[in-house]
A protein has these predicted regions:
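Short, P/G- and charge-enriched loop/turn segments at secondary-structure junctions
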Residues: 84-87, 141-148
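A hydrophobic membrane-anchoring alpha-helix module
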Residues: 174-179, 186-217
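A structural signal for the main folded, soluble domain(s) of proteins
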Residues: 35, 102-104, 186, 200
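Short, low-complexity N-terminal intrinsically disordered segments enriched in polar/charged residues
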Residues: 2-44, 48, 56
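A solvent-exposed, acidic/Ser-Thr-rich amphipathic alpha-helical stretch
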Residues: 51-136
Length: 217
């Protein structure tokens, strides 16, 4: 796919015919897979609160316009991870519906995101995350001290660049198109909860134990 194919009048994400030549086709498939893995790696990094992994998603000169933050993406990682640790007890991000256009060492991607967060109860915690109006409603209905849930959905709009053979995000902008807030409905004792295997937001998470060195264990 040539630079000319990415001209200004080209409609992004429209159906395409296959490129000429098997090598070009394989390169396109490989590049797209690497880009999708970058998008998924972001979700892993943010949910494990792994600052260095989160930085690895972005080039050093990348920017992220992320609602409460708009600036250098490595600074975003330093800003967001401590904030998540301070304000939430758990989080899960899902990235889906990835549409990717590749032109040489540049790419454009749109993907959908869904996020879930649990917020500790109490006036200070609930007011800080949700605002005083929501906290007042919770106080009125007796749920202020309960754990709360915040669910949100939107899209990631990305420009990616391949440098030294590695794809990373160069420009990111997000949209947040809906949210839902409520006291937590999570089952915490009895029933199926006894079989829950919780994750962790640090290297004690079971995913960090995955290794080819212990593959046969």
């Amino acid at each position: 796919m040539s630079e000319q194919d990415m001209s200004a009048d080209r409609v992004l994400f429209a159906p395409r015919t296959a490129p000429d030549g098997q090598d070009e086709l394989l390169r396109l498939v490989y590049d797209r897979q690497q880009i999708v893995e970058v998008l998924h790696r972001y979700a892993r990094a943010i949910d494990r609160c792994d600052i260095e992994l989160l930085k690895s998603v972005y080039h050093e000169d990348a920017t992220d316009a992320h609602g409460s933050f708009d600036g250098n993406a490595h600074e975003f990682a330093e800003f967001m991870v401590p904030r998540l640790r301070a304000q939430t007890s758990y989080g899960v991000h899902h990235v889906t519906n990835e549409l990717v256009e590749v032109a040489g060492d540049r790419a454009i991607a749109e993907s959908y995101m869904w996020g879930y967060h649990r917020i500790p109860g109490g006036r200070e915690s609930v007011s800080r995350f949700f605002g005083p109006a929501y906290a007042a409603r919770c106080e009125a209905d007796g749920t202020l001290d309960a754990e709360h849930e915040y669910m949100t959905g939107g899209r990631y709009l990305d420009k990616l660049v391949k440098r030294s053979g590695i794809w990373r995000i160069w420009r990111r902008r997000i949209t947040v198109e809906w949210n839902q807030c409520q006291p937590s409905r999570m089952l915490t004792d009895g029933g199926r909860s006894q079989y829950d295997i919780p994750g962790a937001r640090d290297p004690t998470d079971q995913s960090y134990r995955l290794s080819f060195d212990s593959f046969d264990e």
